Amino acid sequence: MGSRALVHLAVGLVGLFGLRPAELAVLRVDDEGRLRVGEVKRNRWAMRRAKSERLAVGIDIPGRDGEGRRILQLYASGLVKLPLRILTTIERGEFKPVGEAFRKLLERYPFWQSLATANPGLTPYSLRHGYAWRGHKAYERSLSVRDLAALMGHTPAVHLQHYGKWTDEAGLIDAVERLTTDPLTALVAP
């Protein structure tokens, strides 16, 4: 299996399922074929409750229908594994280094290098932000903050603080136009 396919699997899991890169270490497919994600963040809030798993559901990139299902099937089949650098880091049992291994792996690939050059500030975590954006903006109907926060493994407050930065005037007008039949862009200034 070529290394490109292995990286594609890792990028697909992080980007299409909204994972923290470190969560590549705590994935499993349950008996119903759903992706489950263990905990990697153990902050004060998380320490007060038992470790649990959350459901991760893919949100496809528009025009790439079924890609999340395909990535999940590849992962579940075991025919395509995560890249060796990530697997050996997972074996050490620490989570943060898994995210670092993912970042270093991406930085070696020309496709990521060209994306990063064209989009200053792009990081591996941007794949997770893209998931949040698609859940709220890419489709005619959007997921609620509460639902998307649960899928991403954080609270609605954290979601609003860190994943709502793309709100701008044009986006607000578009959102209202999708909700109503009033074309706000046709308004004429007095």
Please tell me what each predicted stretch does.
Residues 60-115:
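Major-groove DNA-contacting interfaces characterized by cationic-aromatic clusters
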Residues 26-74:
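Conserved tyrosine-mediated DNA breakage-rejoining catalytic core shared by Y-recombinases
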